[in-house]
């Protein structure tokens, strides 16, 4: 997930800083996170929830397409079940790679960072209703709650270039 958030070059910068600071030392996850954050000037405070909270987040997907406005709206909501000693969970910082596949072959690819309980993204100039390819490259270890039609699953299975989502759609 670090490489997904930082990009390949940013991840490399973080690794270089990590080894510069800690080579040969006994370190913690916090040391690794600090090196990634410092090397990329990125606040990863919320990312620590992955280390401090038990359980796997569940992400619910809701989508809406407005043909008249040529606008696609994607709403993601995250929850995590209570666990012993943690009856309530804070939102995780979840990086999700997505791609919108359309009949016109307009492919919008984006990295979404889900940091709140619910967030909505709007995509303009989408010529026809897209098929959503989400959590590409298994960008986050989540449980996905997403009802897709058989037609959409067939489109992903036959046309998606992401091996993880092709497998999941089958």
Task: Say what each PLM segment does.
Residues 1-12, 16-170:
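Non-catalytic accessory/interaction domains
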